[in-house]
Amino acid sequence: NGIERVEEDLMGKERPGIYDPYISVYCIEAGAKLLQREHFDIMYLTTTDFVQHKYAPGSVEANDFLSKIDYWLGELDKLGAIIGVTADHGMEAKTNADGTPKVRFIEDLLNQQCIPSRVILPITDPYVVHHGALGGYGTLYLEDQSQLTAAKAYLQGLDGIETVLTNDEAVTRFELPSDRIGDLVVLADASTTIGRTPSWHDLDKVKEGLRSHGGEYCQVVPMIFNKKLKQDYDDRLVSGTCRNFDLFHFLSNGF
């Protein structure tokens, strides 16, 4: 973005690591200091969800983190910025009664039924300390298309699996591109995650508890503004029909 020497000239301090809860605070603080230095028509500040993965709402750690985010949002407000805050997903605890991660390794389970498949987990990214590549959504490709009905019925009967959709059903229900999803789409319940095989995941990263997202229980997200919206936009906001990608439209036209 053409911004150089952030640590040396803008912030005067070292950037936190990716697994430091305060890397997100650093980002919002940097945005405020940039706006102090020069004018921008639009600023997009994106944070990590490390704290939300590791600490439940109301915990000391979560409250401390959010209070610091709130402070720097307040500094942006003082500078005259119109601020919109949203998220790409919610977050839920995904654990058994003993606190261990609750996982259904569906590729392994299907193999045990002589139904070979390849499971794709969209949550997979380099940041396995966050979530161990475990979330509530998975899609899979079958080696043998004639096993589609049997695979769907088997998965639907598993504890912790709430919904199993064919490609066509998932396209219609979730507005997904047909060529980017597999033969089946699998959604877990609120407290369960979907994995591939036990050997594919490093559960040591989440052995002290797992909070993650995916499925249909993490769809509701906040949309917060620091200025009063026009009445028609306010009506739309409280109607419950907005999507998080509507944020830019609201910021551009709603005041």
Task: Give the location of each predicted region.
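Active-site neighborhoods of enzymes that stabilize oxyanions during catalysis
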Residues: 123-255
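Short catalytic/ligand-binding loop motif for oxyanion handling, primarily in non-cytosolic enzymes
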Residues: 51-55, 92-95, 99-100, 194-196
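Acidic, His- and aromatic-enriched active-site or binding-groove loops in soluble protein domains
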Residues: 1-9, 63-71, 102-122
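Short acidic, glycine/proline-rich loop/turn micro-motifs
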Residues: 54-59, 234-236
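His/Asp/Glu-rich, glycine-adjacent segments
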Residues: 1-56, 136, 147-150, 156-163, ...
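Structural motif
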Residues: 42-46, 84, 185, 224
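A conserved active-site cap/scaffold subdomain adjacent to cofactor or substrate pockets
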Residues: 91-116, 125-141
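Metal-dependent active-site segment of extracytoplasmic phospho-/sulfohydrolases and closely related
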Residues: 64-108, 186
